[in-house]
Amino acid sequence: MKCPSREVFSKFEESTNPQWGKPPSQRSTEEYIKYSLVILDKPRGPSSHEVAAWVKKILGVERAGHAGTLDPKVSGVLPIAIAEGTKVLMALSRSDKVYVAVAKFHGDVDEDKLRAVLQEFQGVIYQKPPLRSAVKRQLRTRRVYSLDLLELDGRYAVIKMHVEAGTYARKIIHDIGEVLGVGANMRELRRIAVSCYTEDEAVTLQDIADAYYIWKHYGDDTYLRRVLLPIEEIARHLPKIWVRDSAVDAICNGAPLAAPGISKFETPFSKGDLVAMFTLKGELIGIGRALVGSEEVKKMERGLVARTDRVVMRRGTYPAMWKRKAKSQSDSA
């Protein structure tokens, strides 16, 4: 999957003061690790929780969290946020997924009929989580964006599926078998993409261990900075709003983003969409939810644009200019 293509709308021409904050590339190695994301190629066998714990141990950090659980027998793309980065994992919570599944049919299947059934399953479907599930087993709707037959060899088929978050691939295979009248079960599953993070950029546990060892023993963090992505990458798929220096600390303290605090933003986005708030140096401040659409923001001179849901930037990284303004207004009153 490719990230959405968006245009940048400039609201105020603004510069940023070099005295506070820093571009992500200028963080020290220790800071870089604390504010990082790894796109892991999870092997078959361990659970998602286990591999996240191993990453935490390798990097010597207190926290590591994964987005989108993979069952032990499933391999593939598993985004893991490191340390402070776990605060904004929700940015990936509802991201689309792409899987490649190996299905075994319990009887002979005509290829044309199989392709027709795959076409029928595209769109909104009803699903009930399987018996062995961590969530409540109630009927729910999920969107299937595409189902493509990559290969059919006898009773085995390789199927690529692009689905909404929370869709059970195993259940789709089972239901396809039922519609075909022969029955089917899933023999193997690999996740090849989460949103626009693909297996092409995924790294292994050994890659992480080697990169950390080279930095610790030889002082070279080049490999480590390739293996770990800056936490800003967790918002790669989200519309971005760049915030003026004067508004950054208010957001760090949980305040909503108001129109006067915006320098520029990506369009389009709609009311209710997740948005990522950045400094003019390219640092991720946090993740919020749009209170108005981007077309309305273009015309706004005041009013609230987004509520702040999660903050990753440390308070005090930028000066509390909002406090000075509030105090000045209080004194003048």
UniProtKB/Swiss-Prot annotation:
Q: What is its EC number?
A: 5.4.99.25
Which CDD domains would you find in this protein's record?
Answer: PseudoU_synth_hDyskerin, PUA_Cbf5
Name the chemical reaction catalysed here.
uridine(55) in tRNA = pseudouridine(55) in tRNA
Q: Where is the composition biased (Basic and acidic residues)?
A: 1-14
Annotated active site: 71
Q: Give any GO molecular function from the UniProt entry.
A: tRNA pseudouridine(55) synthase activity
Region of interest (Disordered), ranges: 1-27
Instruction: List the disulfide bonds in this chain.
Output: none
**So where does this one cross the membrane?**
none
Q: Sorted alphabetically, which keywords does the UniProt record give?
A: Isomerase, tRNA processing
- Spell out the Pfam families in the cross-references: DKCLD (PF08068), PUA (PF01472), TruB_C_2 (PF16198), TruB_N (PF01509)
Identify the InterPro entries for this entry.
Dyskerin-like, PsdUridine_synth_cat_dom_sf, PsdUridine_synth_N, PUA, PUA-like_sf, PUA_sf, tRNA_PsdUridine_synth_B_fam, TruB_arch
GO biological process, alphabetically ordered:
box H/ACA sno(s)RNA 3'-end processing; mRNA pseudouridine synthesis; rRNA pseudouridine synthesis; snRNA pseudouridine synthesis; tRNA pseudouridine synthesis
Q: Which residues form the PUA domain?
A: 238-313
| Its biological purpose | Could be responsible for synthesis of pseudouridine from uracil-55 in the psi GC loop of transfer RNAs.
* NCBIfam families assigned: CBF5, PRK04270.1, unchar_dom_2
**Family according to the record:** Belongs to the pseudouridine synthase TruB family. Type 2 subfamily.
Q: What name is this protein filed under?
A: Probable tRNA pseudouridine synthase B
Organism from which the protein derives: Pyrobaculum aerophilum (strain ATCC 51768 / DSM 7523 / JCM 9630 / CIP 104966 / NBRC 100827 / IM2)
- Report the gene name: truB
